Structures are given as structure tokens and as C-alpha cells.
Amino acid sequence: MSPGNKVATVSAADVRSAISRQLKPHWTAPQGADAEKLVTIIAFTLNSDGTLAGTPELYAQSGVTDANRPQAQRHVELAIRAVKLAAPFKLPADVYSHFHKFTAKFDRQLSQ
């Protein structure tokens, strides 16, 4: 198998799963009214050694209600913190030749 074909065995779903497993220990969803409805997606770029290339940032957020609006910004802050704490990410080296930019979904389910 040539090096170019090796990445074909590592799917995007596998990469997302590996990243989620590494984020989970660093993520605690904020508490409060309707906080379980919040979903925050953070975008970040990784160097070939798994370290962060730049600062993670908010990509999207959903589930914001009048009741959980006070927790929404905290949700983003905690998600960015989790990405920073999880770095450097441990992914197969060949992944970095095909994937540099990542997104991660933070919700109540990830903290369980």
C-alpha cells in the first residue's frame, strides 16, 4: 500500500471520533436553564505535530434561548478552553497531510 492510499483507511468520521475522545476529559458543559439545548461548534487548525496553529474560534452556535443566553458565551469559552487543554492532539501522522482544519461539536452529550 502506498503512503497516499494509507489515509483512505482513516475516514473523516474516525478523525472526528478521535478528536472527540481527546476533548471529552476537558469539557464540562455549563449548568443553568435550557443550558442542555446549547450546541457550540469550534473551528481550529492543527500543525503536523498535533499542536494548535492559532487560536480556536467559534464557528457556529445553536440552541440559544432567552433562558440560556447568559450561559451561551460561557459555553463558547469553555469549548475553546477544552480544545486548548486537549492539544497536542494525538492523531495518525498521515492524517495531517489531508486534514489541517477541524471543527468540534460541544454539547451536553459530550460531557457525559
Description of each model-found segment:
Residues M1-A18, Q22-K24, T28, G32:
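Intrinsic-disorder/low-complexity signature in envelope-associated proteins
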Residues P3, R21-W27, T45-T65, E77-Q112:
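Conserved "boundary/linchpin" sites in short secondary-structure elements
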Residues A13, Q73-R74:
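Short, conserved micro-motifs enriched in small and acidic residues
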Residues G32-A35, D94-Y96:
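Short beta-strand
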Residues L38-T40:
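Short, small/polar residue-rich loop motifs at catalytic or cofactor-binding pockets
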Residues D66-Q73:
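An anionic, turn-rich surface loop/hairpin at beta-sheet edges
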